[in-house]
Amino acid sequence: MNIQTNPLLDFSDLPRFDAFTPECVTPAIDTLLAECRDVVARLEAPMDQVTWKDFVEPLEQATEKLGRAWGVVGHLNAVVDTPELRAAYNENQPKVTEFWTALGQNLALFEKYKALKADAGYAALTPQRRKIIDNALRDFHLGGADLS
């Protein structure tokens, strides 16, 4: 199975459980982690102005894909437990956990979220977008980002 046909990388509709095999897991997760790391690296760089479109949107899009794919893997691991799937899950869980942990303690991103909330444009955002920003700040706090 190649990256183009991997059902874990098809976000056009509901998950294609019927096309899933344990061999899909590592290539898909590695691809999504690489994409997420690239987005994070780009967003860590200095920005003239932190905006929803240039900061939150790309981060949310990248991490949503990873979360969705990993959610499918976790769900299937819980309901269709096979030795092959368990091995794929156990192989990838440390990588996924490491990414989410590092993201939650990323001081550069934390500062950008704080800047976005402090900006005068924050009040003009939709309630849903303000909630996403507030939840991100809460998650950084719970992850220990503001302990240093």
Where are these regions (language model features)?
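Zn2+-dependent metallopeptidase catalytic domains
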Residues: M1-L147
